[in-house]
């Protein structure tokens, strides 16, 4: 047996269908496209034409909406944080900016630390949310948990404070003003 004598199993490889190469090929003239008209031409075809039938997009009602200020929460496990520390991507302090960069997230995302995995070293973690099991494991390892009050985007918009300080400062509660009735 030589390399030159090798061939694929019989019937496993099909010949390519060469369309539009004469009547004798069985795929000549219209090249498998049927008769004349828009469907036989190259380029654009109407994607949702249903003839005279009421189209699907008009048969179904409108529903739902996308909340413009929705919270997007990204979960990060302790095992991921431990791996980042081993790889030298983060030091003993892991902040919201580190999460944003390493999770490929946006500035408006919230981060939650989850308890899957173990931490071998003491780590200071700043995140928006922390699960109970994660908090216990971090404290057992000698670490510290700090809860951030704002997203990075919100913190950047605070003029008086640096981004790090603004992350930790609670948002001011809005005061509701009551309309005073006119006394006559």
From Swiss-Prot:
Keywords: Ribonucleoprotein, Ribosomal protein, RNA-binding, rRNA-binding. The keyword Ribonucleoprotein applies. Pfam families: Ribosomal_L27A (PF00828). GO terms for biological process: translation. SUPFAM superfamilies: Ribosomal proteins L15p and L18e. Belongs to the universal ribosomal protein uL15 family. PANTHER family: 50S RIBOSOMAL PROTEIN L15, LARGE RIBOSOMAL SUBUNIT PROTEIN UL15M. Binds to the 23S rRNA. This is Large ribosomal subunit protein uL15. It comes from Prosthecochloris aestuarii (strain DSM 271 / SK 413). The lineage of its organism: Bacteria, Pseudomonadati, Chlorobiota, Chlorobiia, Chlorobiales.
């Amino acid at each position: 047996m030589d390399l030159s004598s090798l061939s694929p199993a019989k019937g496993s490889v099909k010949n390519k269908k060469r369309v539009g190469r004469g009547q004798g090929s069985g795929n000549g003239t219209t090249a498998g496209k049927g008769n004349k008209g828009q469907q036989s031409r190259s380029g654009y075809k109407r994607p949702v034409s249903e003839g005279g039938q009421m189209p699907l997009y008009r048969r179904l009602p409108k529903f739902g909406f996308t909340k413009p200020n929705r919270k997007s929460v990204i979960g990060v496990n302790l095992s991921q944080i431990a791996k980042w520390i081993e790889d030298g991507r983060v030091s003993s302090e892991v902040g919201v900016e580190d999460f944003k960069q390493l999770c490929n997230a946006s500035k408006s995302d919230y981060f939650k630390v989850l308890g899957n995995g173990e931490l071998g070293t003491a780590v200071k973690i700043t995140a928006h949310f922390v699960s109970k099991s994660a908090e216990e494991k971090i404290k057992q390892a000698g670490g510290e948990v700090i809860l951030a009050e704002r997203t990075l985007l919100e913190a950047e918009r605070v003029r008086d404070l640096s981004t790090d300080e603004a992350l930790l400062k609670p948002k001011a509660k809005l005061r509701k003003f009551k309309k005073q009735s006119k006394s006559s």
